Amino acid sequence: MPSATAAKAKKANANANLKSKVNKAPAVTEIDEQSGHSEDESDFGSELDVEDESAASDEEDEDEDEDEHDLEEGVSDEGEGVSDEEEGVSDEDEDEENQSAGSGSDSDSDSLDSDAPRKRRRTSPTIDDIVTQLEDEEEDDTPVAPVKPVFNNVPSRIKKKQAEAPKTEKTEEATPALPVPEPASTVSVPIDANTTFDALNVRPWLVQSLANMAIKRPTGIQKGCIPEILKGRDCIGGSRTGSGKTVAFAVPILQQWAANPSAIFGVILTPTRELALQIMEQVIALSQPHVLKAVLITGGADMRKQAIDLAKRPHLVIATPGRLADHIRTSGEDTICGLRRVKFIVLDEADRLLANSGHGSMLPDVEECFSVLPPPSERQTLLFTATMTPEVKALSERPPIPGRAPVFVCEVDTQRLAIPATLRQMHLQVPVTHREHYLHMFLLTPQNVDKSVIIFCNRTSTADFLHHLLRLLDHRVTSLHSKLPQSQRIDNLGRFRASAARILVATDVAARGLDIPEVKIVINYDIPRDPDDYIHRVGRTARAGRKGDAVTFVGQRDVDLVLAIEQRVGRQMEAWTEEGVNLETRVIRDALKVVGEKKREALLEIEEQKEVGGKRKRGKEKLRAM
């Protein structure tokens, strides 16, 4: 066969060249070192020696290039590149090949022999790429299959253990720090609906006073708190709006006072003047037939008269923190010495009093008031709120006072049912530019025209503007906000309680504690920024099991605020509807022109500093003279 003969001749020629190269290996090494050639030429000699031994079995090499030097250089380069990338040959193997190529011995050349280059030499150049891809797929699939579960499962188990470990540590660390267990295990509220005040160890004269005020059965917060307070324990009571928190702390205080009357027996702190006045009226009514001396210490009144009243040692002081702190700083020791023997201290709406929110915070004044009160071991401290904030909860985690029973916590519907079940929450979408038009027509719908309404605003300027506007539109309206004199605030609230005014436009000073049973609708003209403020606002209606509606005006930019409120109260607002009423049509037909004209008149009255009704406001000098 000519081809076989030619192949044998080629191999003989190659063998002769190989022997000559081996004999001249040192010279070649020196040339390579001087010229900087790669080790491929040295590899070429060793690979030819291997090929000479396996030439009889490899018929595919007959199609190779006649120039064995060029062919072997290309194959060697390709073999090294592929072996590095696909076969995983390490850099240490390459270093050994370089050293063996420099030595030029046959034994060193044999050490370069490996299965990977020999396999490539036996495959044809045409099929080489395909075979390499198949080998790569097999090599990739083989190690990856068992590795996947290793990397997927092991770290997850580690993370799980790490996630569980801190919880256990936190629980072990937090448990001894708590002075009391969970509220549910601390106070067992009687679930019997027929429970009476007599069963709570309330004195008969107080039961009769409660009956005279149409209070026949205790509520949940009253069932839980009254017996424990009578035992001398400090209390943190949380319950939704309109659940009778004032009675829960007033009854045990009055019962203890009647048994041992003394000067300044208790101090009650509230965040607003109107709430302080309301508590004073309720406490005096409950104290009948006993004669209780109570003093109201709030802003807007003469401090000299208040100082004289404090010096007379009244039985009970109902105050706002700011004004009482002013007396502590400025009045003499004769005025405030009676505060050092107080038996009870009550923080009503404690979440607002203890809020440390920077501007407008009452906490510094509260701390000033506590600075002259007896130490905790010599008094009872009672906290009541409708929203359990972190500041309030932190007080329950304090260590118990030595020699005293631990603080007990009674929470009734403060989180899941912060909104009464009898309250309907609704929203009304209104354009920002025509909010007043929609308000006017909403108040005149057949279902709302006779109902008592409270409209809440975020700013005193907005409340003042709506007061002017609604009066010009012939609504029976009054207002309540911090820019009004105290005497006018009391008069306006009295008019609304007596139904002389159907609508009360107010800021958040009226959002807490005020108990006006006749209120049927609460309108959020401006949406509050804090969802807890929303809870207190809508709590002015649907009190003590009565029904009520809360309607929130929603503009284009108020969606996020509404979603936050819904998440906080756990209930979604429904769209406001009234049968047979298309509010948008009524606004376009009846309100655009009329409300626009009255709006300009109201703004003009405010600019001219006129009171509601068109009378010019009296100057400060005349007010002081009176």
UniProtKB/Swiss-Prot annotation:
Q: Show where the Helicase C-terminal domain sits.
A: 438-589
Q: Which GO terms describe its cellular component?
A: nucleolus; nucleus
Primary location: nucleus
In this chain, composition skew of type Basic and acidic residues spans: 161-173
Annotated region described as Disordered, given as residue ranges: 1-183
Q motif (motif): residue ranges: 195-223
CDD domains, per database record: DEADc_DDX49, SF2_C_DEAD
Q: Which domain of life is it from?
A: Eukaryota
What this chain does, per the entry, is described as: ATP-binding RNA helicase involved in 40S ribosomal subunit biogenesis and is required for the normal formation of 18S rRNAs through pre-rRNA processing at A0, A1 and A2 sites. Required for vegetative growth.
Q: What is known of its domains?
A: The Q motif is unique to and characteristic of the DEAD box family of RNA helicases and controls ATP binding and hydrolysis.
Member of which family? Answer: Belongs to the DEAD box helicase family. DDX49/DBP8 subfamily.
What this protein is called in its record is ATP-dependent RNA helicase dbp-8
Name the gene. dbp-8
